[in-house]
């Protein structure tokens, strides 16, 4: 329609694998090229049935084959692409890849601690500044909600555990049947928060943040947590460690691991926590600013 010469078509995620070859050829006929962001391991997500997971995996293979460049948002995803698909590209070639992560906003919330919006939210949810652990994320099994709730219940912490998520009632019922968390007044499902300034302030005022994502590449909520919450407790997987490095504490999904870490975190001094926060913010400022990410995209698209 716009007669663009040498267009670059950037496809996000690996949904349309069966059509990838057709579109690749048509775009090349127009003098264009195809870039792909393979996203994370969608085929591993527990929310999908076995046939859908199989489709995602096959679709991923076809889309990696029929692209001119795969832009991976994680070093581990880039490594995975080569381990799985080297020699499986067009004419047996290896896929061409590059790494460009996500960015994060490092500015502090505009809300003060005595802002009426924040005060009312805390009052409604029964929470107090620096007296709650926090998690923000999709309510799906691969984000380790069962482990986080189970381990928090086993911990000796006197603090609350605030869970900001859009609850899936079926999954919630399954967790209650397994864990009986409703008997523990510290576990608080507090709904969703779409006001970004309020959410940012809630992050800043958390005693610590849990990140339990086990599937996918660089997760935006992890970068946001590192940029706003001083103390971060992350599940020990490659995707998380490549982002946070030594700026966070790590736990495994094994029984007792996170509970032990929570008890340790509760005993950390104010200075120790502040130092963790300083390192985390420095890490994000050096590697995950939008200026840096946008510059890398400009290089990929213009050069």
Give a label for each model feature.
Residues 4-38, 217:
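An aromatic- and histidine-rich active-site surface loop
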Residues 52-70:
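Membrane-proximal helix-turn-helix segments that form the acceptor-binding/catalytic region
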Residues 65-96, 104-109, 118, 144, ...:
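A short, active-site helix/loop in glycosyltransferases that binds the activated sugar's phosphate group
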Residues 104, 136, 160-175, 188-192:
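Glycosyltransferase donor-sugar binding loop
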Residues 122-143, 149-156, 162:
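Conserved donor-binding/catalytic core segment of Leloir-type glycosyltransferases
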Residues 201-217, 230-231:
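Acidic donor-binding loop of glycosyltransferase active sites
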Residues 248-256, 264-270:
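Conserved acidic donor-binding segment of nucleotide-sugar-dependent glycosyltransferases
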Residues 272-287, 296-299:
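A short, well-ordered alpha-helix in the C-terminal region of glycosyltransferases
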């Amino acid at each position: 329609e716009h007669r663009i010469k040498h267009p670059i078509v950037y496809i996000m995620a690996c949904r349309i694998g069966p059509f990838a070859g057709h579109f690749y050829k048509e775009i090349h006929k127009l003098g264009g090229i195809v870039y792909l962001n393979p996203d994370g391991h969608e085929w591993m997500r527990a929310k999908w049935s076995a046939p859908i997971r199989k489709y995602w995996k096959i679709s991923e293979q076809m889309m990696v084959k029929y692209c001119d460049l795969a832009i991976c948002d994680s070093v581990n995803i880039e490594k995975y692409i080569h381990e799985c698909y080297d020699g499986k590209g067009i004419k047996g070639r290896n896929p061409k890849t590059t790494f460009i992560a996500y960015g994060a906003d490092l500015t502090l919330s505009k809300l003060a601690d005595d802002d009426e919006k924040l005060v009312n939210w805390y009052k409604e949810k029964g929470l107090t500044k620096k007296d709650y652990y926090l998690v923000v994320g999709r309510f799906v099994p691969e984000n380790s909600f069962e482990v986080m709730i189970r381990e928090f219940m086993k911990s000796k912490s006197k603090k609350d555990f605030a869970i900001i998520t859009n609850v899936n009632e079926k999954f919630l019922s399954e967790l209650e049947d397994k864990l009986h968390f409703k008997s523990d007044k510290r576990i608080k499902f507090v709904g969703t928060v779409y006001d970004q300034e309020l959410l940012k302030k809630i992050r800043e005022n958390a005693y610590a943040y849990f990140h339990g994502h086990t599937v996918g590449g660089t997760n935006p909520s992890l970068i946001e947590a590192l940029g706003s919450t001083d103390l971060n407790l992350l599940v020990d997987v490659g995707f998380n460690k490549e982002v946070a490095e030594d700026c966070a504490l790590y736990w495994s999904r094994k029984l007792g691991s996170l509970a032990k870490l929570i008890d340790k975190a509760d005993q950390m001094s104010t200075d120790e926590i502040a130092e963790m926060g300083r390192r985390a913010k420095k890490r994000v400022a050096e590697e995950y600013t939008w200026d840096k990410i946008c510059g890398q995209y400009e290089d990929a698209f213009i050069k």
